[in-house]
Amino acid sequence: MSTENTNTAVAEEIPNLLITPSAQEYLHELLAKQNTPGIGVRIFVEHPGTPRAECCMAYSAPEEVVPTDYKQDYPDFPAYIDAPSIPYLLDAVIDYNKDRFGGQLTFRAPNSKVPRVGPDASIEERITYVLQAEINPGLAGHGGNCSLVEVQDDPEHGLTAVLKFGGGCQGCSAIDVTLKQGVETTLKEHILELQRVVDQTDHTQAEGAYFK
């Protein structure tokens, strides 16, 4: 596989997206049915960096190629990656799993929902980034999630992040341990000015929670 990019704005962000051999074979068969010389696939993310992020793939005929797309050449077809989507496709894998019903194309993109933050990002944006990138993937193992409600400048305790736990974390008997040893520690490691982390969630409402 070779790569090519004419967009200097993202020249340092080379995508490492992988299309496995089995997926390449499957896509090659689909593309061959289009009877269009030089046709490839275009890969992009809708609503990147949000909980609604969705990874997409579409046919891309030669005349439809977007000049700023990053081109990956596979043996039987080209793949064009939407330049703004590149950071959200980090470590993404497109695979094809055969089964008795035929098979299924799968798209795993662990960073598609992770928001990006720049050097001038607000503390709210930085906290949300850490929650999405570092904390929620671990909580997801219990069917839980965590989101930022607000940041308060508490006169007594200093800068305080108020969090809301949901899903499997709601009603969890070990929430204090989870908050203190996990979430709070991780947030303070990444955001040095943060002094305290508190939980806004009412854990008495245990219905539908993972832990009871």
From Swiss-Prot:
Keyword 4Fe-4S: yes
Pfam families for this protein: Fe-S_biosyn, NifU
Cofactors (names): [4Fe-4S] cluster
Position of the signal peptide: none
Listed GO MF terms: 4 iron, 4 sulfur cluster binding; iron ion binding
Listed GO biological process terms: iron-sulfur cluster assembly; protein maturation
Residues binding [4Fe-4S] cluster, per UniProt: C169, C172
Annotated keywords: 4Fe-4S, Iron, Iron-sulfur, Metal-binding
Coiled-coil segments on the chain, per record: none
Keyword Amino-acid biosynthesis attributed: no
Family, similarity comment: Belongs to the NfuA family.
Stored HAMAP family: Fe_S_biogen_NfuA
Subunit record text: Homodimer.
PANTHER family named among the record's database cross-references: FE_S BIOGENESIS PROTEIN NFUA, IRON-SULFUR CLUSTER SCAFFOLD PROTEIN NFU-RELATED
Protein's name in the database: Fe/S biogenesis protein NfuA
Organism: Acinetobacter baumannii (strain SDF)
Lineage: Bacteria, Pseudomonadati, Pseudomonadota, Gammaproteobacteria, Moraxellales
Encoding gene per record: nfuA
